[in-house]
Design a protein with these regions (language model features):
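Gly/Pro-rich turn-and-neighbor structural signature
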Residues: 1-76, 190-225, 230-240
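Compact, glycine/acidic-enriched structural inserts
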Residues: 111-159
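TerminUS-proximal long segments
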Residues: 257, 261-303
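Internal mixed beta-strand/loop scaffold within catalytic domains of large alpha/beta enzymes
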Residues: 44-121
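Glycine-rich, often proline-containing surface loops adjacent to acidic residues and nearby aromatics
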Residues: 83-86, 120-127, 175-196, 240-242
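Short conserved micro-motifs at the rims of enzyme active sites and ligand-binding pockets
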Residues: 71-73, 193, 252-258, 276
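C-terminal, helix-dominated tail/subdomain
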Residues: 230-273
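Extended, acidic-biased charged interface segments
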Residues: 138-227, 231
């Protein structure tokens, strides 16, 4: 399973970076191959200062070896070996009319002293963070997510959409980071799904990513915008940074376990603002976005 999934994310990384380069038309992804001394490594690809994408990363990694002490405590296990691989991406567009997107698909195994698998699971998801709310874009993104889920279980979309809204929530601001999507974790073999079926589901979601996101980018990338709208984008990006550094389990975990800092922090945007006690004007497009972030909508149901 681990080789099957790693081969899949290698191919998916190629597909996604090629597609985004074609949309941008100016910038290319730079590749950084790195090695983890305890075992494994990764292939980081970063795009910067493009015509469409200001900064973004599409990274894959495959790490293995003894489970670090912090992870032993987290999983409540003793000294065991592990394997983990995944693809993680964050794309920050230049235009405030184009939403930021995040996605992650991952697989984890734990072994006993004889090397037999004692636990294994998939996790992942994809979510959208707009700066200006185009309802048709929100409906499209969620409809694609729902379509991918429905092929495997009619309850998945509702469950994983709810988890996404709950997870990507800035509790200190009382608002969501974005308009959600899917979030799932600890997808283990059970009475209704074996690991091959979970693999089929997770790869279905991965394969849906470009359909969910790129048509939105194409539709919005040439819209005009003002300096004030760009300021709003940078203020909202500040909320993105707050979530990633204050609440995100993956970021905090990486920082606590001596993870690769460049890969961990690649999710942060290049230009951000924090304006003291900032509030959008009443009745403005900016306020409309905030209302939705505070009160999540069932986008797929209204599509």
């Amino acid at each position: 399973m681990k080789n099957q999934f790693y081969n899949y994310i290698e191919g998916l990384q190629d597909q996604i970076t090629s597609s985004l380069e074609a949309i941008d038309g100016l910038a290319k992804f730079e590749e950084d191959l790195w090695v983890r001394k305890e075992g494994g490594g990764g292939r980081t690809r970063i795009i910067q200062n493009g015509a469409v994408f200001e900064k973004g990363g599409v990274n894959i990694s495959k790490v293995h070896g003894p489970l670090p002490p912090a992870m032993q405590a987290y999983f409540n296990v003793g000294e065991v070996d592990f394997f983990a691989c995944g693809l993680s991406l964050v794309i920050h567009p230049k235009s405030p009319m184009v939403p930021t997107v995040h996605a992650n698909w991952r697989y984890f195994e734990m072994y006993d002293k004889e090397g037999a698998i004692v636990d294994q699971w998939f996790g992942g998801g994809q979510d959208l963070t707009p700066y200006y709310l185009f309802e048709e874009d929100a409906k499209h993104f969620h409809s694609v997510c729902k379509s991918a889920c429905d092929k495997h279980d009619k309850n998945f979309y509702e469950d994983y959409k709810k988890r996404c809204d709950e997870y990507f929530y800035n509790s200190h601001r009382n608002e969501g980071r974005g308009i959600g999507g899917l979030f799932f974790d600890y997808c283990k073999a059970n009475d209704t799904m074996d690991m091959e079926q979970w693999y089929a589901f997770v790869t279905e979601v991965g394969d849906s990513f470009l359909e969910a996101y790129t048509s939105i980018v194409e539709k919005r990338k040439n819209l005009t915008y003002t300096e004030a709208q760009r300021d709003w984008q940078e203020i909202r990006r500040g909320r993105y940074v707050e979530f990633n550094l204050v609440h995100d389990k993956g970021t905090l975990f990486g920082l606590k376990t001596n993870g690769r800092i460049e890969s961990i922090l690649m999710s942060l945007p290049a230009h951000v603002q924090w304006v003291y006690d900032h509030h959008p004007e009443k009745g403005s497009e900016e306020e409309k976005l905030i209302e939705v972030l505070k009160n999540p909508i069932e986008w797929a149901a209204s599509a």
